[in-house]
């Protein structure tokens, strides 16, 4: 399964081989080696266990081998390039080869087989190679011409499903391959894993060890071996190492291996590069050496792990001068307000980097050397006799050693931990004292804490998971399984040092109360309960340990353990108490009313915390995402209502730099969830509900598997305790404030809770109820559509100015008009809303209640749907600064003959009709790039229209008016392009020569765009050498390959590796209000520094061009969609030199890609450099595209597994024929965009898109979260839950619920502060 590049070779250890020696022939003469009878040659086969060095080209290469049919005790070292050796073949890759069907001998089938490639060939094999079919042990020799590469896993489905032996062997190959990819990289994901290392001692073949550290720099592993204590460092490229999977179990239809899910910045970072997604996660054969996310190995006894350290605070950058704000709606920003900054991070935590571990190349007694040393048969040291038995096998983990570089506990200790005075209520500046002051009234005093009722996990006393009142031996506990992920301190990519070598300087170190003799004595005497303020590892051994600390206890270095209490699942959560005998025991857990000012202040709309937001922006944000926030509140209330009254809800306070995630589906936990009181296993509301429903119905729970608890006990839903993260009732109180603020500011609310009543969605309303609500003037809402429930309707007005107008004062319909803008005119007069109340147009949409995730509603179906994005602005519009479109609107309305309103489908129709009606003759004559006259569209912004007037292209990236124009199209879910950015950038920074000079020696993985094969062992310099020079490109079968860099720079390293380029990009990227990390309309910027900030880039995408006619069916990046918005900048276009007629081929590709005439003129007449051909589709058409691809798959005989998706798998590129079929059969037409040098393509969240490079391109993408497209982020997060564990999109890294909450919280704080400054009630 190893795909290699050119003549380079992979690591040899662990591979099967074939050897042919002249000494084994009949007479040793050359004539006896008849190629016609190659199968009869005296081949010897076996397995390579160790090598003298990794350079296979050196003639002194020696390998330690075990021959088949011989005892391992007869292993020996052989010289590969011996004079008597005629050939030496090694396992190479997985292919398809023709053979007779095992079932029907007359039938010829394509069968998966492993090929061998010659390392030495003196026998003249030439094109003949050895092949072993999966499921058979016998080898055959075939011509290479008869072998076909495996392009898609679907080509294997027949052989895998029909033959269980083949299926099992294929799965074993995948597991072996994934293990090797981690081992050979020194991956920190292996920390805690049990491995077996090949022994050269004659008394034993293997010995066991535990991985305690990984070093990606030297690609070695640090291990702990009780048999040979001197063994510390292992190089898997020199000696055979295997990961032990001793907890392989089957859940449903999928096998999962006991391993720990840990996120690694060295391995894909905290957010996997979107470019890497072009390789189908569904096809292991297509990605043979891809570092698949470690969630492939979902643990059984071990869970997910702790987090990556926190990244640098992006707000340290100066905020750019804001462009034009959203429409001024009659309010001003109060002077002298909201200038306080958020609580600052500890500077040392932000700026400290881990020092690389300097591993000495000492030779241990085991005879294992680092790569700097060479192993020979003469100087090989034999293993010593094992002095002890192997340690008890531990559950295998696929774990990153993040504990070595984690921040100290930065979270303030709960006030109840220490007998200190309660904080003054005046310390918090509350935006709404009457409604929020009650939180502080419930702040606990020290006496309250000691007498507080304990949370006994909400289970019966005889429950097997109940830990209260009895001791649990540490050995009986499950190992570490934490999904508290991704701390916010950035770790050096080369870091592999232990915690003792990576101190965080000047960080506040709060000692546990148990380390203070005076406080300890007082607690022992009083028996007062206190909160656990240290990790389980550092507490007495008799207490049950959480899943995280159980694994941490395997670490022998106590210095590494004590600095990481924040990753303990019971840290600041579990309550402890000394009994009358002075023995420490578990007393319970914190309750929601036991918070302090620090804890509650994180979740309240405090004006002192509002930074980087103005009044107009606050109103705009609340208008767009307020309904989604209300839907979140309703969902929380609904989940809370299902909890039995007798069960006490626990409170787990947010821990700084740690992200709570569901142990089952990897979704970020927002608030309510369920926790095991014994091991800390936690599940989200959705997984808990699904599990409980299936248990009640007796159905098999096949979608997700649940990790097991102590002693492999099953986690039963009734034994988990409900737990919330937001303290007190802050969530519901902020929800009340949102309604109050929206009513006072006239912000329209379409949320289901706007009637101030909570209704369950499970019971649809009766027809009589619908009729009554219709008569009352209520209208269907977007929130109801999202939940597919027609019973929740909104009253006509909600307080404030909106409530001042009686229902009977509606204006009659205006005379009919044929103007295409008449429907938009109603946005200011309110006619659209009145018409919606009369027609009830959303009921047909609600019929689709079977699907969990309804497709996005078409823009043409209802103006109610448009209302959320286009007109969810404030009701009172009193001036002319509300947007250029509103200035153009006529007051007349138009109706068709049947009396229904004639509403244009999309905003493009408006502009198109204007241009066609008034400037038809001018448009046909105007030259390329000429702007439309300002007098026509009412604004002076350089721009033009592409894709037949459906794509807005802004020409001045720094124009302050771009803001208004961009937003009007962006609301409609349309992509937008901005040109000319390359004139602003420092071109010297983005040339291939600069990258080659700075990073040419770095080792990277490459992807062959034609086959999606991953190539290892190359350097960055190898890629850049062929960027503009085709003859210098890496070759496959003597043909230059079309390559792209995979995940480079890796993870979040762009800013650290390329600070000058990062600054250059951020200073010149268009529309900084959206695209910058601190942009006021980038909702991700609203997430406090207390939380783990999502990695939104920048990411680099570097790839060669696909020029030939045959390449038009391939994509540089296949069709996929992303959970966030993105701005993709073309910073460099490299045209290969010496290629004839390539310009003509590029033109044909552009024409074949359905580009419009103006785009072609840019290439021919404007002499601009085309970089990439994009095809982008509207998010609302996603479901149609999905159905179309499934249909095509079925036509081609491919399967559609339930846990895979044709779009998320990124296994399709829509060529011309498929695009034509999609348009004819489903009516889906996208945007064909050619991205020239300096163009920035804005892709909306949830919009399917694909990319085909025309020339060699360097692109940089920055992701952001805009208010207009939050709903797509919300839906996609739910979709990704159901993807298989191998998907890079499976894990929720955007934290969309947290982003929505804190964006609304800050907007409310700003509006409340502004309201009080104007003296409003």
Swiss-Prot record:
Cofactor binding summary note: Binds 1 Fe(2+) ion per subunit.
**Residues where N6-acetyllysine is found:** 895
Q: Name one GO cellular component term.
A: membrane
Query: Out of the domains of life, which is the source?
Result: Eukaryota
- Where in the numbering of this chain does the JmjC domain appear? 1058-1281
The reactions it catalyses are:
N(6),N(6)-dimethyl-L-lysyl(9)-[histone H3] + 2 2-oxoglutarate + 2 O2 = L-lysyl(9)-[histone H3] + 2 formaldehyde + 2 succinate + 2 CO2
Where along the chain is Fe cation bound? 1120, 1122, 1249
* Main location per the UniProt record: cytoplasm
The record ties this protein, via InterPro entries, to: DUF7030, JHDM2-like, JmjC_dom, KDM3AB_Tudor, PWWP_KDM3B
Tell where it localizes. Cytoplasm; Nucleus
Gene Ontology molecular function, alphabetical = chromatin DNA binding; histone H3K9 demethylase activity; histone H3K9me/H3K9me2 demethylase activity; iron ion binding; nuclear androgen receptor binding; transcription coregulator activity; zinc ion binding
What does this protein's UniProt record list under function? Histone demethylase that specifically demethylates 'Lys-9' of histone H3, thereby playing a central role in histone code. Preferentially demethylates mono- and dimethylated H3 'Lys-9' residue, with a preference for dimethylated residue, while it has weak or no activity on trimethylated H3 'Lys-9'. Demethylation of Lys residue generates formaldehyde and succinate. Involved in hormone-dependent transcriptional activation, by participating in recruitment to androgen-receptor target genes, resulting in H3 'Lys-9' demethylation and transcriptional activation.
- Name-wise, this protein is Lysine-specific demethylase 3A
The organism encoding this protein is Homo sapiens
């Amino acid at each position: 399964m190893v795909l290699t590049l050119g003549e380079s070779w992979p690591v040899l250890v662990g591979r099967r081989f074939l050897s042919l020696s002249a000494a084994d022939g009949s007479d040793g003469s050359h004539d006896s080696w008849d190629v016609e009878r190659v199968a009869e040659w005296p081949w010897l086969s076996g397995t390579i266990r160790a090598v003298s060095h990794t350079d296979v080209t050196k003639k002194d290469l020696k390998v330690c081998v075990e021959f088949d049919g011989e005892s391992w005790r007869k292993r020996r070292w052989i010289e590969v390039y011996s004079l008597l050796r005629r050939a030496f073949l090694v396992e190479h890759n997985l292919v398809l080869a023709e053979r007779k069907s095992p079932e029907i001998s007359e039938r010829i089938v394509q069968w998966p087989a492993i090929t061998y490639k010659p390392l030495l060939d003196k026998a003249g094999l030439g094109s003949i190679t050895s092949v072993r079919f999966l499921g058979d042990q016998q080898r055959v020799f075939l011509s290479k011409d008869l072998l076909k590469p495996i392009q898609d896993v679907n080509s294997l489905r027949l052989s895998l499903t029909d033959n269980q032996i083949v299926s099992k062997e294929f799965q074993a190959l995948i597991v072996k391959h994934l293990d090797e990819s981690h081992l050979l990289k020194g991956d920190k994901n292996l920390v805690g894993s049990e491995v077996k290392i090949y022994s050269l001692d004659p008394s034993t073949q293997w010995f066991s060890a535990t991985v305690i550290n990984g070093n990606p720099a030297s690609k070695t592993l640090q291990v702990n071996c009780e048999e040979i204590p001197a063994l510390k460092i292992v190089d898997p490229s020199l000696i055979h190492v295997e990961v032990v999977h001793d907890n392989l179990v089957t859940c449903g239809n999928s096998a999962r291996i006991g391993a720990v899910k840990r996120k690694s910045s060295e391995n894909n970072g905290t957010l996997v590069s979107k470019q890497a997604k072009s390789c189908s996660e569904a096809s292991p054969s297509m990605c043979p050496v891809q570092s698949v996310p470690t969630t492939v190995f979902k643990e059984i006894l071990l869970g997910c792990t702790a987090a990556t350290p926190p990244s640098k605070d992006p707000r340290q950058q100066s905020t750019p001068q804001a462009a034009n704000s959203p429409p001024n709606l009659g309010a001003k920003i109060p002077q002298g307000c909201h200038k306080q900054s958020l609580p600052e991070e500890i500077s040392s935590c932000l700026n400290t980097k881990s020092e690389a571990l300097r591993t000495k190349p000492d030779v241990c007694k085991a005879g294992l050397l680092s790569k700097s040393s060479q192993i020979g048969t003469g100087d090989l040291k034999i293993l010593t006799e094992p002095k002890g038995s192997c340690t008890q096998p531990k559950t295998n983990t696929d774990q990153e050693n993040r504990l070595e570089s984690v921040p100290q506990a930065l979270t303030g200790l709960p006030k109840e931990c220490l007998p200190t005075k309660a904080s003054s209520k005046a310390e918090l500046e509350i935006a709404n004292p009457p409604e929020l002051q009650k939180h502080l009234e419930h702040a606990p005093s020290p006496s309250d804490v000691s007498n507080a009722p304990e949370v006994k996990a909400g289970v019966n006393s005889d429950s097997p998971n109940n830990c209260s009142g009895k001791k649990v031996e540490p050995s009986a506990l499950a190992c570490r399984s934490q999904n508290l992920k991704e701390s916010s301190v950035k770790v050096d990519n080369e870091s592999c040092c232990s915690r003792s070598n990576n101190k965080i300087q000047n960080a506040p170190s709060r000692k546990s109360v148990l380390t203070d003799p005076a406080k300890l004595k007082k607690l022992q005497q009083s028996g007062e309960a206190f909160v656990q303020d240290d990790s389980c590892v550092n507490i007495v051994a008799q207490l049950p340990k959480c899943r995280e600390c159980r694994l941490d206890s395997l670490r022998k270095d106590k210095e590494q353990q004590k600095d990481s209490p924040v990753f303990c699942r019971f840290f600041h959560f579990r309550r402890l108490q000394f009994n009358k005998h002075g023995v420490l025991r578990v007393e319970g857990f914190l309750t929601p009313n036991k918070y302090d000012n620090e804890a509650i202040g994180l979740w309240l709309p405090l004006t002192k915390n509002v930074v980087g937001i103005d009044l107009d922006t606050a109103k705009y944000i609340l208008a767009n995402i307020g309904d989604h926030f209300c839907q979140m509140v309703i969902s929380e209330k609904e989940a809370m209502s299902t909890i039995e009254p007798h069960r006490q809800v626990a409170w787990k306070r947010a821990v700084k730099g740690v992200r709570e995630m569901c142990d089952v589906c990897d979704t970020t936990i927002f608030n309510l969830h369920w926790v095991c009181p014994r091991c800390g296993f936690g599940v989200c509301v959705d997984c808990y509900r699904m599990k409980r429903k299936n248990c009640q119905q007796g159905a098999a729970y096949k979608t997700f598997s649940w990790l097991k608890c102590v002693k492999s006990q099953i986690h039963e839903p009734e034994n988990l305790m409900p737990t919330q993260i937001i303290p007190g009732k802050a969530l519901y109180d902020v929800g009340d404030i949102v309604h109050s603020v929206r009513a006072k500011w006239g912000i329209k609310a379409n949320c289901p809770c706007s009637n101030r009543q909570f209704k369950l969605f499970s019971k649809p309303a009766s027809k009589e109820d619908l009729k009554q609500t219709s008569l009352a003037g209520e209208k269907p809402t977007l929130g109801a559509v999202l939940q597919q429930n027609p019973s929740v309707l909104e009253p006509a007005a909600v307080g404030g100015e909106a409530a001042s107008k009686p229902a009977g004062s509606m204006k009659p319909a205006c005379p009919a008009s044929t103007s295409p803008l008449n429907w938009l005119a109603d946005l200011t007069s309110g006619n659209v809303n009145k018409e919606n109340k009369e027609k009830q147009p959303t009921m047909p949409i609600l019929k689709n209640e079977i699907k969990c995730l309804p497709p996005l509603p078409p823009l043409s179906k209802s103006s109610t749907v448009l209302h959320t994005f286009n007109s969810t602005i404030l009701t009172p519009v009193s001036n002319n600064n509300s947007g250029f479109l509103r200035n153009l609107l006529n007051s007349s309305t138009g109706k068709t003959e049947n009396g229904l309103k004639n509403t244009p489908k999309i905003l493009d129709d408006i502009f198109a009709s204007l241009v066609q009606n008034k400037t038809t003759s001018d448009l046909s004559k105007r030259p390329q790039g000429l702007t439309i006259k300002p007098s026509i569209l009412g604004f002076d912004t350089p721009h033009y229209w592409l894709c037949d007037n459906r794509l807005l292209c802004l020409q001045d990236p720094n124009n302050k008016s771009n803001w208004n124009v961009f937003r009007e199209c962006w609301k409609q879910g349309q992509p937008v392009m901005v040109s000319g950015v390359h004139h602003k950038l420092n071109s010297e920074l983005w040339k291939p020569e600069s990258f080659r000079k700075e990073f040419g020696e770095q080792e990277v993985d490459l992807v062959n765009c034609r086959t999606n094969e991953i190539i290892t062992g190359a350097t960055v310099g190898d890629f850049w050498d062929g960027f503009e020079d085709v003859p210098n490109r890496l070759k496959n079968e003597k043909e230059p390959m079309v390559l792209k860099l995979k995940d480079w720079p890796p993870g979040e390293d762009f800013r650290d590796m390329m600070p000058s380029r990062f600054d250059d990009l951020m200073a010149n990227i268009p529309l900084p209000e959206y695209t910058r990390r601190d942009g006021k309309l980038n909702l991700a910027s609203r997430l406090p520094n207390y939380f783990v900030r999502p990695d939104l880039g920048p990411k680099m995408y570097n790839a060669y061009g696909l020029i030939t006619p045959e390449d038009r069916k391939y994509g540089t990046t296949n069709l996929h969609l992303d959970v966030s918005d993105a701005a993709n900048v073309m910073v460099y276009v490299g045209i290969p030199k010496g290629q004839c007629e390539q310009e003509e081929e590029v033109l044909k590709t552009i024409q074949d890609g359905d580009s419009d005439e103006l785009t072609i003129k840019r290439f021919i007449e404007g002499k601009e450099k085309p970089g990439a051909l994009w095809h982008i589709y509207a998010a609302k058409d996603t479901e149609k595209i999905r159905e179309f691809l499934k249909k095509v798959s079925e036509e081609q005989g491919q399967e559609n597994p339930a846990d895979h998706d044709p779009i998320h798998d990124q296994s399709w590129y829509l060529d011309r024929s498929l695009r034509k079929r999609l348009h004819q059969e489903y009516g889906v037409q996208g945007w064909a965009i050619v991205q020239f040098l300096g163009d920035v393509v804005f892709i909306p969240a949830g919009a399917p898109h694909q990319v085909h490079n025309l020339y060699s391109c360097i692109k940089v993408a920055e992701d952001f979260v805009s208010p207009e497209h939050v709903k797509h982020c919300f839906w996609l997060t739910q979709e990704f839950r159901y993807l298989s564990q191998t998907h890079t999109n499976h894990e929720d890294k955007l934290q969309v619920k947290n982003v929505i909450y804190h964006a609304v919280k800050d907007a409310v704080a700003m509006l409340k502060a502004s309201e009080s400054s104007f003296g409003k009630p």
